[in-house]
Amino acid sequence: WYFWGNHFTISDTQTLGSYSTGAYQREFLRANMDKNFETMVTEATLAWPMIMHLDNKDNVGPKSESGRSEWRKREKEPATINENHARELMELHTISPDGGYTQQDVIELAKVMTGWRPKWTKGRDHGHDVKFDRERHEPGKKQVLGKVYKSGKKGINLAIKDLVNHPSCREF
């Protein structure tokens, strides 16, 4: 499990005190070590500590329902695509820095990943389960490494499947 803990790493920095690495290793990495790589990547990508660590909780599609909401305009808090998690998914978890992706591929994968966030619990600033929030998901088709993904919840699973089957992933 030590290898996978380094491959799908998170840290106790930022607000991750309660999103501890121990819980992450126990609940996600160790629980999936006997699964195939695609399952491991999917489970690690959609794990609440990884979503928090790589800021996908802040990944809101500008054209999404939430992104176009009046309160964002009133409070001057525009919705933004957060590329951090998408870049790490390609660069560190699947196809490597030499995988042939472009900055546009990172942006498009980040759009695929919009809407995935922890389920918040009332009175607390974090959650322990993950949900897909359609209101925060960027609508429309996205193209990553030449493959087109429809809008919606299934996009992340299809994108991960394509990334783990990419020739660069096998070499990485």
What role is predicted for each listed range?
Residues S18-F172:
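Active-site substrate-binding loop specific to GH73 endo-beta-N-acetylglucosaminidase modules
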Residues W1, G5-Q14, T21-F28:
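Peptidoglycan glycan-strand catalytic modules in the bacterial/periplasmic cell-wall system
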